[in-house]
Amino acid sequence: TTEESDTIKLGGNFELSGGASAYGTLMDEGIKMAVAEQNAADGLLGKEIEYVSYDNKSEPSESTSVATRLATEDNVVAILGPATTGAANAQSPAVTRAKVPAILPAATGDGVTMDGDSVLEYVFRVCFQDSFQGKALAEFAQTDLQATKAVILVDNSTDYAIGLADAFKETFTGDIVAEENFTAGDTDFKAILTNIANLDYDVIFLPGYYEEGGLIIKQAREMGIVQPILGPDGFANSTLVELAGADNVDNVFYASHFTPNSEDPKVQDFLAAFEAEYGKPADSFAALAYDAAQLVFDAIANADSTDPQAITDALAATEDFEGVTGTFSFDENHNPIKSAFVIELQDGVEVGNSIVEPAK
């Protein structure tokens, strides 16, 4: 058992290659930094923390294998990751069987901590969920952008985008003038953009990831479509601006878990340390993963134990955890009660952010 061991082993199940590797790599780096900092401050319970991570190749089936290997062969006391909702759902049966807690930094799909109506005892997340960001973006569209007519361009190949579109439609009180579909991996969006080019609307809602998002922004702006474009947290990657071209990224807004422009000294220290360690800026995914690691350290300290069940119970009891992505407690479904940021981009650069509070 881990009780006799002189290190505390934490596992990482991340997308280090494949389609979601831009997210997974930053998360893995955020955790490595948190572990190094904690070890420099004398570790936990008098022991050094050892972090073991494997690549799930952005494949759900591989995510299951990695989780099983970490829990049963490496005997980790907790697993951090994976990044995506699909990979997280694939991991859940394995961590439930092994009775080892998993902390999801960024899996935003609504049901990810649930099995039907009952909560998964060993699954927690530090990010807000899709129904919340879909609602928050609809609120932002009608309140901050004063939009009364919207067009939705939805990636109909991912549960992520479909869930976001549904939550937006439920909340938006104006008219949905048109809804067009695309598929992950598409590169030419002229047809769907031509369909909406001459319609009368105030905002485009674009639930999808940064690859297609960046190309759609580029092609829309090049066709003279000037309306604000609103996206989810999947836009939060610098590749979005690279693909779109900075001069095309005007009036683009997206939901984020994190803003680097926070005054909080904790956030500024984190950003400086990450930049020094990796020679690149931290993004919201690095920040969420860093918080996920800190949350586990917190739970181990509060449990005063390296027993996975004791850590699980301490995680469930988390209250007012102060992370770099905000302060939160867990609700009964292991979702954090926290705010979202809506980031505004002009010329590809963040020029402002608004806070959208969770509904009480």
What are these regions (language model features)?
Residues 22-29, 44-114, 126, 181-189, ...:
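Beta-alpha junction/loop-to-helix N-cap segments that form part of ligand/metal-binding clefts
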Residues 16, 120-184, 203, 296:
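An alpha-beta-alpha
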Residues 2-4, 8-32, 54-61, 83-84, ...:
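Extracytoplasmic "Venus flytrap"
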Residues 63, 125-150, 162-164, 188-190, ...:
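Hydrophobic alpha-helical segments within soluble ligand-binding/sensing domains
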Residues 1-9, 40, 357-360:
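Short, low-complexity disordered leader/linker segments with a strong preference
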Residues 276-286, 297-350:
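Segments of small-molecule ligand-sensing domains
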